[in-house]
Amino acid sequence: MKHLSTILLLAASMSAGAQTHVLDVNTKKLGAPVQPTMYGIFFEDINYAADGGLYAELVMNRSFEYPNHFAGWDVSGNVTIKDDGPFERNPHYARMAPTGHGDKHSMLENRGFFGMGVKGGQEYRFSVWARVPDGGKAKLWIDLVDNATMGEDQKLCNAGVEVSGSEWKKFTAILKPKTTFAKAHLRVWADSKVTTDVEHISLFPTDTWKGRENGMRKDLAQALFDMHPGVFRFPGGCIVEGTDLATRYQWKNTVGPVENRPLNENRWHYTFTNRYFPDYYQSYGLGFFEFFQLCEDFGSEALPVISCGLSCQFQNPDPTKPGVHVALDDLEPYIQDALDLIEFANGPADSKWGKVRAEMGHPEPFNLKFLGVGNEQWDYDEAHGGFGPVFTARLKKFSDAIRKKYPNIKLIGTTGPNSEGWDFDLLQPRMKELKVDLYDEHYYRNEKWFLSHGLRYDSYDRKGPKVFAGEYACHGSNKHKWNHYYTSLLEAAHMTGIERNADIVHMATYAPLFAHVEGWQWRPDAIWYDNLRMFKSVSYYVQQLYAMNKGTNVLKLTMNKKPVAGQEGQDGLFASSVWDATTGEVIVKVVNTGDQAQPVNIQLQGIKGARTANTITLCHDGMDDENTLDEPEKIIPQPGTCQVEAGKLAAYINDNLPAKSFRIYKIKK
């Protein structure tokens, strides 16, 4: 019946004068391999992606290290900050002393990240480092509260901790709220008659991803796993550079005991004054060890990015200004950091940095293969500052040192922040001269750009480095700035060109990945969430569909012997095809960006005989519609089937592709 409906629709379209587009797929000759790393994910701590997001810690400013030491905390009674605590790089702690007013208790109340989302019946692990300075005993009372309730009792649940001795020790308790609440607070009450010191106050759900104590929020990590990422780029883009060198991302600060990982500012807390979050910092609870663990969990190749000694060039355009960029002659510590990172990931457990990894619970190497040097860096020509090769001169020093000691590591350079223009044109040939293995392209562009760049990679130099499309998304005009259906559809169209050119494009990652609905600075994003719920944008599903149907080899697909890339006469169609040796399937992806349904005839050269094919379709009428927390599955891919007909020379599919739709055909050969 479905097949009959398809024929009738096709006939109706043809009778109305619509041209049938013939897509020729050559299944007899395999093209370039599709790299396992082709479709991946890129994590940057923007939009509260780490603290308040993927990292499951519920307490904000748990070690009192924010510049405002009580940021995130409400205080009552006699509470002061001291700076001689047990952790060298996080020395501050809170002293909770008697108030001098009878039984009145000193109290700390943490508001979390836009509140604390807690679920009824689930256990939460409270922990604190504490001591009684005079060596006696004291009790801490721990409450999870709804402090806005009109009910008789604010407490959702409570527990107690007995503290004893003048030495710092870790104490734990389990809290189990009876009801679910999105905006809970954590209260810590001190003994009214004894001084108690507290440090690193923490609250985690016990049900984290893989059950790890310093773990990830389970639903968000699961969403990443479900994307089937072949590569995982981390820890970010601009945060790698830092506003200045002091605030750059330093991986060594993110490993070892979590209590001793020093706080760093997050450059995204002040970048946009219209979305200003002054209490947005990086606790580094989610550090390089945890990133490598996630790569292992997901089956992804790790792609860490390190500072090249240039802070953000947007904010510091003059490279001669003292203190914002490292002089070439002073690069050695930065290069050593890169070498040490490779040892941390791959070195034996008895090496200096391999030992750190082993002590964290992973004596086996992580088998790192890729390393990015720099983010959106660039050189200058005479017409644009005249400062010369400030990036590539530094990149060469990194490359020489890394190639000498670790020749098997694949190095990734960059062509700067733009997908075309003087800086891109300057850097692209220099990446070839430096013989980097891949270079990282970034493009956040509008609808017109995505519609007109379907052939972007067809003319790229095949003799140079491979391409990593490391950050991209369609940023629609006006209200399309959100994750609307139409912009996601254009991303799907663009990705046919990425796939068709798998011989030159080896990696591609959409960006950004995460956004908290109350704490975002940048949109669109792949995954949105609040403290309890999450939803996957349409862009997420586009990425997932490509990753789950990437195949193993490109198959040539043409219309009138031309690539199907929205060219003149193709009526807004984009298409690509791959062979999947694992499943024995020919996979054809077709995107119709046009306003009308398009009848298509897909000729499957090399396949004979009728059969039924599986389809997956992403189609929606409202171009401005999107998924939301309240309607998380408003727009999702739909499975189906279609009939493959037995032609005289080749099997074929007749279909009427709906307007503004993306359809995948999976044909057993």
In which residue ranges do the predicted regions lie?
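Hydrophobic h-region of N-terminal signal peptides that target proteins for export
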Residues: L9-G17
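Surface beta-strand/loop "capping" patches
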Residues: F64, G120-Q122, N553-N592, Q598-V600
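Conserved, mostly hydrophobic/aromatic
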Residues: I41, V128, H228, C295, ...
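C-terminal beta-sandwich/jelly-roll accessory domains of carbohydrate-active enzymes
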Residues: G566-E568, N592-K669
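Catalytic-core region of carbohydrate-active enzymes that cleave or remodel glycosidic bonds
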Residues: K397-A401, P407-K410, P429-E433, D437-N549, ...
